[in-house]
C-alpha cells in the first residue's frame, strides 16, 4: 500500500511581504527557512504545527500555475480549542467568520490570507 503524506501547502502570493507578515504576525507561525534565488525572488517555509506552508515569489513549477483561477480550496486545520485560538488572532479584515458551531459538528472560524486563500480552524467535537 502506498502511504502518501501531506508535505506542505504551496502558495505563490501576489505580495510576498504581506503574506509573510500574515502567516508570521497574525497566525504566529514559525519560520523554518528563508531564501532568495539567483533572480532576487524570495521564499519562506513556515511551520504551523502539523502543517507547513511554503510561500515563494517564483516557484519552480510556475509554468503550471494559474493565477486567474477562482478560489478552489480551503486549508482546514484541526485545533483543540477554537475560542482560545481565535482570541490569539489580532482583529482585522482577515477574519471571515468568528467562532461558530458549523453543520459538521465542529466549532470553527475562518481567516483569509492576503491573496484570498481561506484557512479554516476546526475544533472537532466528535472524534472518530
Predicted regions and their residues:
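Conserved beta-strand-loop-alpha-helix junction that forms the acyl-donor binding cleft
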Residues: 13-16, 38-39
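Alpha-helical macromolecular-interaction surfaces
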Residues: 17-18, 84
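Short glycine-/small-residue motifs
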Residues: 118-121
Amino acid at each position: 500500500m502506498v502511504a502518501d503524506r501531506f508535505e506542505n501547502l504551496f502558495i505563490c502570493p501576489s505580495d510576498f511581504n504581506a503574506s509573510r507578515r500574515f502567516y508570521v504576525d497574525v497566525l504566529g507561525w514559525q519560520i523554518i527557512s528563508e531564501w532568495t534565488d539567483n533572480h532576487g525572488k524570495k521564499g519562506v517555509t513556515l511551520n504551523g504545527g502539523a502543517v507547513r506552508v511554503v510561500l515563494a515569489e517564483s516557484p519552480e513549477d510556475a509554468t503550471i500555475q494559474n493565477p486567474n483561477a477562482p478560489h478552489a480550496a480551503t486549508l482546514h486545520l484541526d485545533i483543540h480549542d477554537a475560542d482560545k485560538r481565535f482570541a490569539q488572532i489580532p482583529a482585522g479584515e482577515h477574519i471571515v467568520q468568528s467562532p461558530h458551531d458549523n453543520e459538521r459538528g465542529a466549532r470553527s472560524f475562518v481567516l483569509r490570507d492576503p491573496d484570498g486563500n481561506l484557512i479554516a480552524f476546526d475544533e472537532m467535537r466528535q472524534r472518530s
